[in-house]
């Protein structure tokens, strides 16, 4: 019996080590993955996902979508300001390495360029959405034919509206006869961008407790500090090291949002690259997914959105006037939606944050900059059977129900499953 338990324990440990090796291997291939939620949308720079052909006779006729805005500037000016102040202080005392002085000069330039741009969409972010729309029209041209309606709605935040407009111009160029509506109204935010104080309080509690403990266990700063400071004790004693490293992590991770050759990934060794990813990954699982730490509450933030998706699809199927409902918002809305729908098992309940990597709960595959969910609806002549396929960041993902045609599912089954789940 003891031998069996030992073997089981060894298998569990080995699986955990294997999972971390897997994500390390991913990061070795592309250090930008370390940025987690800052990860720039990977296509077309990476090989495009292959799509399973539809069953014989079925053609796409409708798309329902929710997308995160594209790559952006950081959303708080302090994220640029505070690292400059910290490094300037260290420089006054002669405590910076040559690389540290170079980083300070680069950060001053970045801070200057950020003025008036905080939180705004970058040119790369605009191109990401152009590419997403172009592939949508290429993969599903039937949806964008004729004179039908493409109904686009956006968060009232400018970067989301601009993300929407960069897709709109692609649809209009593809087929000028389309009726493309684009709107950004506070009247739609009750389902487009929903949050409440309960979620905020659960997030605050987790930040102060479980997430703080997790970060302490995954904060290896030796290489990072030695790269910047000649006296790391000075840095730890004289600077607000937690705020400094947090803001530096944001800048380093978000450099990929810009068309620039300036990179700071060399400041991290391999363990620190992994830690950077692990901490962001854990944060998002707790803050907007199914974590027991946040009482499994966060997916419920997307209930209004899921109802809107179902009701909009019902209307499109019934009257045939709308060919696509496209919604443009934020990571904090897309994540709860994917978790609520449990697409690709991303709504899994995982008790231990250390198990996230081995369970393939990988943030950068869910909500990178420009991340999106596309539900593609299919039908065939002389049949009432509607099929639906889910694409998460253009990759086929499963619904949490059986299907004889996976990755295609009978819409009636999907609809019934989610309506029962939404019923109080």
Predicted features along the sequence, with ranges:
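Signature for phosphate-centric chemistry
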Residues: 20-151, 155-325, 329-424
């Amino acid at each position: 019996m003891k031998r069996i338990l030992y073997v089981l324990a060894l298998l569990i440990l080995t699986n955990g080590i294997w999972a971390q090796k897997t994500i390390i291997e991913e990061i070795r291939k592309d250090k930008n993955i370390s940025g987690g939620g800052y990860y720039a949308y990977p296509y077309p720079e990476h090989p495009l996902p292959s799509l399973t052909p539809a069953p014989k006779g079925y053609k796409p006729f409708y798309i329902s979508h929710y997308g995160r805005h594209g790559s952006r500037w950081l959303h708080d000016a302090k994220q640029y300001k505070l690292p400059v102040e910290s490094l300037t202080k260290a420089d006054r005392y002669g405590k910076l390495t040559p690389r540290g002085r170079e980083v300070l000069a680069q950060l001053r330039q970045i801070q200057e360029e950020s003025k008036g741009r905080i939180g705004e969409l970058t040119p790369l972010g605009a191109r990401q959405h152009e590419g997403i729309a172009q592939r949508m029209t290429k993969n599903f041209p039937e949806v964008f034919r004729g004179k039908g309606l493409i109904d686009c709605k956006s968060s009232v935040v400018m970067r989301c509206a601009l993300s929407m407009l960069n897709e709109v111009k692609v649809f209009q160029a593809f087929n000028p006869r389309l009726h493309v509506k684009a709107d950004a109204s506070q009247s739609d935010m009750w389902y487009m961008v929903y949050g409440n104080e309960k979620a905020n309080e659960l997030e605050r509690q987790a930040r102060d407790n479980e997430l703080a403990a997790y970060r302490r266990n995954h904060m290896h700063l030796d290489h990072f500090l030695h790269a910047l400071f000649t006296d790391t004790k000075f840095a730890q004693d004289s600077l607000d090291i937690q705020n400094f490293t947090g803001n530096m992590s944001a800048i380093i991770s978000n450099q990929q949002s810009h068309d620039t050759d300036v990179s700071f990934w060399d400041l991290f060794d391999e363990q620190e690259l992994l830690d950077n990813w692990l901490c962001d990954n854990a944060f998002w699982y707790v803050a907007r997914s199914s974590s027991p730490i946040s009482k499994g509450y966060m997916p419920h933030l997307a209930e209004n959105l899921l109802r809107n998706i179902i009701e909009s699809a019902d209307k499109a199927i019934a009257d045939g006037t709308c060919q696509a409902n496209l919604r443009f918002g934020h990571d904090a809305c897309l994540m709860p939606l994917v978790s609520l729908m449990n697409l690709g098992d991303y709504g899994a309940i995982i008790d231990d944050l250390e198990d996230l990597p081995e369970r393939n709960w990988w943030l950068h595959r869910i909500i990178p900059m420009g991340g999106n969910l596309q539900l593609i609806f299919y039908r065939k002549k002389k049949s009432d059977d509607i099929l639906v396929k889910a694409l998460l960041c253009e990759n086929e993902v499963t619904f949490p129900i059986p299907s004889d045609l996976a990755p295609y599912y009978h819409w009636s089954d999907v609809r019934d499953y989610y309506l029962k789940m939404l019923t109080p």
